[in-house]
């Protein structure tokens, strides 16, 4: 492959050197900030053998090339343009300028929660393993594994502690990540999180039970002002708002406190004032809002049943195209942290249905495509990848390009999601939203069985609808 020629052709299709403001690359994609995306020649890019697909998200225009090749093409781009590679964070910052306020808000949530996902995934998957060990009826009739094989009980207890830690101490993770994102000191953010989950406080999990039972809530009395001594274990919204206040106060103090006293007074005053504000006003208010949000979404999912699942499943892929799905991470984290009352997250199973359907549609396109060997090759690899939870190549490289597979995919996603919602399948962990996602699913009410059946439904419907649409005259000769 002539990488120099490929780079020249890509640059020309992007609108020329003057249209590129910043550029970098990841493992598989060129990531660019363009002055005017309207100048991009999508057809020319699609005709290039080296390009597997393109899409625009988060203020960035991304060109899918593939592992092992993208770095070589990018190296030639650097030589041609004379521009050095920007860091990924610099490209993200530059791309943010092209976003509207809502897109910036979604990106903010993504920036905060994506770094802590590994901890949430680890805790959630360990929770799944613990459920396998402790749930009755999996290995023995009406009995759990640890009831029959008592030697596993110690292991189950240990895993249960490991699993609960990331959720119970979630404010510490959020505090660190959010403070960093808001321009404050990340360690002060973590310290604030530690304060909100201090063991001397009444646990956030015990607080609703105490209210329901009419028990007295412990409180501080500050000059006649009673402040509840209640923790914020597993809480998302209170910690987000509190950390924003902390970072704002910290940055303000650093502007007015003399340098010689900065390291002494700024942390002291920032933590003291934010802690007081949080326990007095912000915490109780945002805790209530958080309960309303998670309870409201859970009620909609359970009340809406199959119809609600159908609508969400139909809309999920279009939401992904806009990038708004990143905002779901915060909601999912709260739903899973409150799984004792919510039962877990309904978003993960529906995301899986969308991914499976995108993969099925891409595989259907593989069998339909006759002339375009390049697209046929992309469809086969992308289809398998989507079944395993990675949908970008399938969605942007095949299904949206041909249009009718995307229609088939959203129909399959809708039907599969309707089944999921009807049987109230939920996830107790974040993980890979695809075939490997079984371990993230709650085993209650035959959740694993219904999850598997729903994936089969989504696959068959998406594959079948895509194949049927290919015979329609308006789509018959489309091989972009």
From Swiss-Prot:
SUPFAM superfamilies: Glucose permease domain IIB. It comes from the Bacteria. Residues 120-480 form the PTS EIIC type-1 domain. It is found in: Cell membrane. Disruption phenotype: Mutant is deficient in sucrose transport. Gene3D superfamilies: Glucose permease domain IIB (3.30.1360.60). PROSITE patterns: PTS_EIIB_TYPE_1 (PS51098), PTS_EIIB_TYPE_1_CYS (PS01035), PTS_EIIC_TYPE_1 (PS51103). Pfam families: PTS_EIIB, PTS_EIIC. The chain crosses the membrane at residues 109-129, 158-178, 182-202, 264-284, 303-323, 349-369, 405-425, 449-469. InterPro entries: Glu_permease_IIB (IPR036878), PTrfase_EIIB_Cys (IPR018113), PTS_EIIC (IPR003352), PTS_EIIC_1 (IPR013013), PTS_IIB_1 (IPR001996), PTS_IIBC_sucr (IPR010973), PTS_Sugar-Specific_Components (IPR050558). It catalyses: N(pros)-phospho-L-histidyl-[protein](out) + sucrose = sucrose 6(G)-phosphate(in) + L-histidyl-[protein]. Residues 4-87 form the PTS EIIB type-1 domain. The active site is at residue 26. It is a multi-pass membrane protein. CDD domains: PTS_IIB_glc (cd00212). Keywords: Cell membrane, Kinase, Membrane, Phosphotransferase system, Sugar transport, Transferase, Transmembrane, Transmembrane helix, Transport. Its EC number is 2.7.1.211. One of its GO terms (cellular component) is plasma membrane. GO terms for biological process: phosphoenolpyruvate-dependent sugar phosphotransferase system; trehalose transport. GO terms for molecular function: kinase activity; protein-N(PI)-phosphohistidine-sucrose phosphotransferase system transporter activity; protein-phosphocysteine-trehalose phosphotransferase system transporter activity. The phosphoenolpyruvate-dependent sugar phosphotransferase system (sugar PTS), a major carbohydrate active transport system, catalyzes the phosphorylation of incoming sugar substrates concomitantly with their translocation across the cell membrane. This system is involved in sucrose transport. The PTS EIIB type-1 domain is phosphorylated by phospho-EIIA on a cysteinyl residue. Then, it transfers the phosphoryl group to the sugar substrate concomitantly with the sugar uptake processed by the PTS EIIC type-1 domain. The EIIC domain type-1 forms the PTS system translocation channel and contains the specific substrate-binding site. PANTHER family: PHOSPHOTRANSFERASE SYSTEM TRANSPORT PROTEIN, PTS SYSTEM TREHALOSE-SPECIFIC EIIBC COMPONENT. This is PTS system sucrose-specific EIIBC component.
